[in-house]
Amino acid sequence: MFYPDPFDVIIIGGGHAGTEAAMAAARMGQQTLLLTHNIDTLGQMSCNPAIGGIGKGHLVKEVDALGGLMAAAIDRAGIQFRILNASKGPAVRATRAQADRVLYRQAVRTALENQPNLMLFQQAVEDLIVENDRVVGAVTQMGLKFRAKAVVLTVGTFLDGKIHIGLDNYSGGRAGDPPSIPLSRRLRELPLRVSRLKTGTPPRIDARTIDFSVLAQQHGDNPMPVFSFMGNASQHPQQVPCYITHTNEKTHDVIRNNLDRSPMYAGVIEGIGPRYCPSIEDKVMRFSDRNQHQIFLEPEGLTSNEIYPNGISTSLPFDVQMQIVRSMQGMENAKIVRPGYAIEYDFFDPRDLKPTLESKFIQGLFFAGQINGTTGYEEAAAQGLLAGLNAARLSADKEGWAPARSQAYLGVLVDDLCTLGTKEPYRMFTSRAEYRLMLREDNADLRLTEIGRDLGLVDDERWARFNEKLENIERERQRLKSTWVTPSAEFAADVNAHLTTPLSREASGEDLLRRPEMTYAQLTSLSAFAPALEDEQAAEQVEIQVKYEGYIARQQDEIEKQLRNENTLLPATLDYRLVSGLSNEVIAKLNDHKPASIGQASRISGVTPAAISILLVWLKKQGMLRRSA
């Protein structure tokens, strides 16, 4: 039977991608349905209890700038907040928070249940309704059919998921949850390229069996950082420390002696695992010169006795896992409450997607999260938001939107996936962005909130706060530009006390702040340049904008040059065999990838600058040279 009411957008899956997709579509005013096999696991953290980190924190801030959920949820659930790379430049500083799993899930569910235009429904999806290469709905396991103008697949590791512990394996979407086998089979019938990937998780330890007294503590930062632009530290629950232990030669011997029982090394697992989050087996074998690896013991929550040992993801048999755990300092008597495991699952080639994350072959069908070959909550959330907003726009007969590489880490993520694809689980790093000086955590709102407002994602309260911040920044910069000090002034000695080279000529507040040794706090502590802004975010922005003004201007010039190529569109139906002068290799790669623009084509491996020049000349000759707005 058909459900009586049609929807604009259906989201399949309630993880980090699915919840962001559902919130985005509903915020934009579209009638949205979120289908999940279990409402109680909405926003579940399947692996590590943490949000953020290098590159990942940038994505969370961007999701927040576009009105998303993740940053606000972790502000209410974070039990330890830190700024990573705090001593380095602003481009690579990143926020990270340990999470209370239960509080995080509660924060996500509360937001979903209070979001207008959004309906939750508990049923596993087994089929899609596709008519004339267009998706028009979904079918649940009890045969109930839902109609919609767009469908977003955010199914994580559930598609034909297979869990491995030692040489034993069984079907599962994650520990304790069933896999989605019928939907996997249905998707394999569609004209989509599919492969297998693998990820893993460590065993969980009973905290009461760990001797923390012999371990080093790691505390959060004080003052506590905040993730959301709209958040504040008073929202954070009780803060707790993490602890640090290490593997040792005994640990490594246990692993080496049992490699024949590892499903990866025995050839049982076919899927490729994440390069930047390897299993402990991989670390021991790949870094054989290391006699120890640092392991962080992270609490899973304020009301839980479980500890997440970050760094010993494994699929070795349970008896070997026990030996590994008990070989480490402080854990000689530790008990495992959940075994570690590896999981293999289907993923679909993201090169078959448009930058909006809509399928090139099935109209109205969007993909987001691990199904696209990524790993990590943050990467999933960012894709979910993008897919959800574009599903909403499609259902309203509006053009899709995707950020450029120069606008957001989300733009880098999507461009990497859709242009290059991936053969291993993809995670975000700041090093993946060529314009990272422009793509900082601190300016995510300046880059994206106005766009989010235009898209219908940003509410009135956030918009008012954002504009107030802009006004504070502009007013303070003007004040510093117009406040001067001369070498002969009475307070010049106070200024010189903060400078490595004394004043030799008249200088404005901005001139002084531009000096490497002068901070905004020091400058505004001087009577001539007081008072400091009360808005700490605006004050930080003033300092960064002034100190890095020259570098930022130079990078902006580079971006504008690149945009000329980036915005030169390529016809989706162009057969590159028609372009004389291109090599057979380039023709094959362009016909395979079908890039949307010259910029995208230039990033395909093997497509040379000479080939791009030939293509531009041919397009001009054919009268097909056009640029997007």
From Swiss-Prot:
FAD binds at G13, G14, G15, H16, A17, G18, V125, S180, Q370. GO terms for cellular component: cytosol. Its main location: cytoplasm. Keywords: Cytoplasm, FAD, Flavoprotein, NAD, tRNA processing. NAD-binding protein involved in the addition of a carboxymethylaminomethyl (cmnm) group at the wobble position (U34) of certain tRNAs, forming tRNA-cmnm(5)s(2)U34. Homodimer. Heterotetramer of two MnmE and two MnmG subunits. Belongs to the MnmG family. This is tRNA uridine 5-carboxymethylaminomethyl modification enzyme MnmG. It comes from Salmonella arizonae (strain ATCC BAA-731 / CDC346-86 / RSK2980). The lineage of its organism: Bacteria, Pseudomonadati, Pseudomonadota, Gammaproteobacteria, Enterobacterales.
